[in-house]
Swiss-Prot record:
Chain residues that bind GTP: S15, G17, K18, S19, S20, V31, Y34, T37, N118, D121, A149
Its membrane topology: Lipid-anchor
Lipid-bearing positions (S-farnesyl cysteine): C179
Protein name stated in the entry: GTP-binding protein Rheb homolog
UniProt motif (Effector region) ranges: 34-42
Residues with Cysteine methyl ester modification: C179
Gene name of the record: Rheb
Single biological process term from Gene Ontology: vascular endothelial growth factor receptor signaling pathway
Record-linked Pfam families: Ras
The keyword Amino-acid biosynthesis appears for this protein: no
Annotated GO MF terms: GDP binding; GTP binding; GTPase activity; metal ion binding
Amino acid sequence: MPTKERHIAMMGYRSVGKSSLCIQFVEGQFVDSYDPTIENTFTKIERVKSQDYIVKLIDTAGQDEYSIFPVQYSMDYHGYVLVYSITSQKSFEVVKIIYEKLLDVMGKKYVPVVLVGNKIDLHQERTVSTEEGKKLAESWRAAFLETSAKQNESVGDIFHQLLILIENENGNPQEKSGCLVS
């Protein structure tokens, strides 16, 4: 099968770990320092169900509730990773606003999304429950994962699940494995 190229935008409030998730996925390392992102692009070849994908990740600048949705992220993107920190209720609220703006700008009722609760290594500081994340993802018909970029926990699963959602949206359903990651 020929390799397919898929463009994915990482979106969320500032300091939730979007860049750390990208770097962990692409380079296999965790960068501890925080340097606010303007925009970075990462590329990795990923195989899902015997299909190779060139995954282009766009690591966006952090958004807030007042951000105007960047129109360029509504064109030529196949899927979205919306990230919040389990230690920040504010980031959870902002991700809801980003999702609504995304649907509004795209003029659609559904887009392939994985909702990610990051920083589970900081579980003692948790302010957003797993149940809250699951309920929100269900209401969006999105996949949901809790991750730790620092400990590389479930990072690859984000992109694996999103690629499957994208293929299903494009009318190419993947066979089901019977395995659920939550």
